[in-house]
Amino acid sequence: VLGPIIGGFFAGADSILGITGWRWVFLVNVPVGLVALFIVARTLHVSHFARPSAIDWWGAFTLVVGVVPLLLVAEQGREWGWTSPNSLTAYAIGVAGLIAFIWVETRMGNAALIPMRIFKDRTIAIALGGGVVVGSGMFGGMLVIPLYLQIVHGATPMDSGFQMLPMVLGMMIASVVSGQLMTKTGKVRIFPIVGVLLMVIALLMLSRISADSDIRGVMALMFLFGLGLGNTMQPLTLAVQAVVDPRDMGMATSAATFFRQMGGTLGVAVFLSVLFNSVSDNIKNAFVAAAKDSSFVAALSDPAVLANPTNKAFVTALSTQDTSAFGNVLADSSVINALDPRLAHPFKVGFATSMDLVFLLGAIVCAAGLFILLFMPEVHLSSRSAQQRAADDAAARAAGVAGPTTGAQRTVTHDLVDAVTAEAGGHSLDELPDASEAYQTRPRS
């Protein structure tokens, strides 16, 4: 809830303690992270059983080689040119790195950074693949909303943070409600599908807004978009956690976040490229249309307007067909708020038109993600933890029973595992992370 507001406050500050304001958006996470680390260390007490394992150094190295060049070209591609030698080199290195990563992971087995075996599960493969696509459209669309509020409606960074609270509220409500419903029903599949559908609807409606749209209507659409976000992100992660082998729980959870963030990074880069590649032409078209507007024409010769140096410099550049006036605005959009509203309106129309295109592309990408998620099988949440499931399954195998156990049978296996683990060190069933290994190493009687 506080994130957009605090971020807006820092972004709007020139300097805090001698440090540029926007840098505090990152620095503030340091003390917050330290406090969170302290709380976790003091309150979270989970039994740890050390197991010998190899570190997948080659997997980590090839993943970095594959991802970093792609992130670099995503960040710099608009400046370099998407088909420039620098970009093509980054593409080649990135693809080669990812191919090498897959080759390494298939040979590392259980020690792999991301074991390839998890992709054999249809639910995991679809959740991760859909997460990449949805993340691309989701983060791309989210990025444009504050730009619309600040450039088109003239909001300060902090004001735009307040205006985005409906989206945060929608996320909170949807997260809580979907969490309660998933707990009661044990079903997950429907929630990300509904969530992405809501995002598609919200983005389609956002693609219809203009420079003159009522901010209250825009905030209502942000709330709808937030409802979609709240129904999507956590359920997709839960779907992966529900079906993955307990020993792969941490890896699969981090992989789900990683894939979604990677999709978001690429989406942001592509959508920003679309925005700024189209905005110049849209602004020029808006000024051509404004030349037929009597109020705009009157402002060009209004002495009160020309008394402002910013207005006068812009009108002079416009009358001499100096295109640098447009470039200055693209380099620093805050100039728009310094202009007379009649002179600034074509700029806002041009930006709004380009943003509409980005919202539309976001809706199309999210719709593609929705199509992928439709193929995800139903996932049923378990009332037992991953540790308990692993222990019960191991106990069933030790007792000569195939598969997971329930009911009275589960009571017997609990007693059996407790007896064996007590002999091994006094740990109870719920403390046992992977009882299967204990039975594999103990001789059968």
What are these regions (language model features)?
Residues 1, 5, 64, 172-173, ...:
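Hydrophobic/small/kink-forming positions within alpha-helical transmembrane segments
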Residues 1-59, 85, 169:
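Helix-loop-helix hairpins in multi-pass membrane proteins, especially solute transporters
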Residues 2, 12-15, 141, 147, ...:
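Small-residue-rich alpha-helical segments with characteristic i,i+4
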Residues 31, 58, 72, 80-251, ...:
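Transmembrane core module of solute transporters
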Residues 49-53, 110-117, 283-289, 379-391:
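Short, Lys/Arg-enriched, Gly/Pro-containing loop segments at transmembrane-helix junctions
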